[in-house]
Amino acid sequence: MPHLSPMSWITSMLMFWISVSILFSTLWWSNNYLFSSKMTNCAPKSLTPWNWL
């Protein structure tokens, strides 16, 4: 029976976290673009979380 070696487990976890980070960065950039293009005049710029970074 093939068993999952620690190296392949680490590799699968790395691939999982890379895909999750890519997904969240894509959502963050699209949200940033939509917010800055549509709601710039409606909200103070100091309240937007991407200006804190």
Curated annotation (Swiss-Prot):
Spans traversing the lipid bilayer: 9-29
Keywords assigned by UniProt, alphabetized: ATP synthesis, CF(0), Hydrogen ion transport, Ion transport, Membrane, Mitochondrion, Transmembrane, Transmembrane helix, Transport
Keyword Transmembrane helix tagged: yes
Places the protein is found: Mitochondrion membrane
Cellular component terms (Gene Ontology): mitochondrial membrane; proton-transporting ATP synthase complex
Entry annotated with the keyword Nucleus: no
GO BP terms: ATP biosynthetic process; proton transmembrane transport
Topological relation to the membrane, as annotated: Single-pass membrane protein
Domain of life: Eukaryota
Entry function: Mitochondrial membrane ATP synthase (F(1)F(0) ATP synthase or Complex V) produces ATP from ADP in the presence of a proton gradient across the membrane which is generated by electron transport complexes of the respiratory chain. F-type ATPases consist of two structural domains, F(1) - containing the extramembraneous catalytic core and F(0) - containing the membrane proton channel, linked together by a central stalk and a peripheral stalk. During catalysis, ATP synthesis in the catalytic domain of F(1) is coupled via a rotary mechanism of the central stalk subunits to proton translocation.
Subunit structure, as described in the record: F-type ATPases have 2 components, CF(1) - the catalytic core - and CF(0) - the membrane proton channel.
Sequence similarity: Belongs to the ATPase protein 8 family.
Descriptive protein name: ATP synthase protein 8
Naturally occurring in which organism (per UniProt): Lumbricus terrestris
